[in-house]
């Protein structure tokens, strides 16, 4: 790998570019220039309402990251005390790490090749009396088979918490991701289609979970009135964290959300053009089933084997075209192997895909 390439400007084609326009600058400037309410401003609740409406969910809570959103959701549902949570190993590591944050145990399950999401037909073999929830992940903007997973969760009385960090705007059978599961989390990190630099959100149809999440993200405090405009002492119902999104971040989220469908359409058009150009080669393109709407947060291909994948990866890097391996199996990370005695070979499809995938 060419270590001399270190900055995003050094790449002919970087990993991602952020779309921004004057509307972003204008609303952020408006928040800055008012000289107050950079925290707990009206933009936060407005963004929450807009996201909930966009995905057709009853409630939304914004936070400072997708990882905080996962952590807060587990806390809100009372997951902990060595409960078991079914998760993919083919994911970003916070999908599993956040389970450990609440003293629960991540149980790694294999994925299906068509969506790179959890294989619903394999979930039953991982259930025990301690299983509390299933946490599927939507890979790169492609929905997993969430409807089948939901059916399984309901049959087995398990919570369904969707790690949709990469999938805001995607849908399956006409249903927006964020409206199907008990709760869904989104990330607004820099490489997402809708980005605020950092940020996250949770959608749910449960009012009680919504109320718990608001306490968890802000010190366990009841904010019937803006904390910084209330001369009286606040009421604290529980312990909580400082996971709030700032007003400036929320303002950027509002303007980015207005452009989201346009950005998705551009990505889908670009993906189609790339597919037309590379389909003659010996590779597989990750597009998902016909009933799903892939937003192409990432464009990923599968090569024949690890050797070919690695050679292409290094070739692209030398040509200053950024490519990356999303993802290496979490269960083969040294920390998880040491802690849970996870081994090579236990998740054959995950391990196969991880050796072939290139983004």
Regions found by a protein language model. Name each.
Residues 65, 111, 139, 190, ...:
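Short, conserved catalytic or interaction motifs in soluble domains
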Residues 42-50, 54-60, 121, 125, ...:
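PLP-dependent aminotransferase class I/II
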């Amino acid at each position: 790998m060419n270590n001399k390439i270190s900055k995003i400007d050094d790449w002919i084609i970087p990993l991602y570019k952020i779309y921004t326009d004057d509307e972003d600058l204008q609303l952020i400037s408006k928040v800055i220039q008012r000289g107050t309410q950079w925290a707990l401003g009206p933009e936060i609740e407005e963004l929450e309402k807009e996201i909930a409406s966009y995905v057709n969910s009853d409630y939304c809570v914004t936070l400072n990251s997708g990882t905080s959103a996962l952590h807060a959701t587990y806390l809100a549902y009372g997951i902990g005390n060595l409960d078991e949570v079914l998760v993919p190993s083919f994911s970003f590591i916070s999908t599993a790490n956040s389970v450990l944050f609440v003293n629960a145990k991540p149980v790694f399950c294999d994925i299906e090749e068509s969506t790179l999401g959890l294989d619903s037909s394999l979930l039953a073999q991982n259930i025990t009396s301690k299983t509390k929830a299933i946490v599927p992940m939507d890979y790169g903007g492609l929905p997993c088979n969430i409807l089948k997973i939901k059916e399984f969760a309901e049959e087995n009385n398990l919570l369904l918490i969707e790690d949709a960090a990469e999938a805001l705007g995607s849908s399956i059978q006409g249903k927006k991701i964020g409206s199907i599961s008990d709760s869904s989390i989104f990330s607004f990190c820099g490489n997402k289609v809708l980005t605020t630099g950092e940020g996250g959100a949770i959608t749910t149809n449960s009012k009680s979970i919504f109320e718990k999440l608001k306490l968890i993200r802000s010190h366990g405090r009841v904010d019937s009135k803006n904390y910084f405009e209330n001369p009286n002492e606040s009421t604290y119902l529980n312990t909580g964290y400082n996971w709030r999104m700032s007003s400036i971040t929320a303002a950027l989220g509002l303007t980015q959300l207005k452009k989201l469908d346009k950005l998705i359409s551009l990505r889908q058009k670009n993906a189609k053009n790339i597919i037309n150009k590379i389909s003659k080669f010996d590779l597989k393109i990750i597009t998902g089933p016909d009933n799903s709407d892939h937003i192409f947060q990432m464009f990923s291909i599968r090569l024949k084997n690890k050797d070919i994948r690695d050679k292409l990866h290094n070739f692209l890097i030398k040509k200053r075209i950024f490519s990356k391996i999303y993802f290496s199996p979490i269960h083969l990370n040294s920390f998880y192997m040491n802690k849970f005695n996870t081994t090579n070979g236990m998740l054959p499809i995950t391990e196969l895909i991880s050796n072939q995938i290139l983004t």
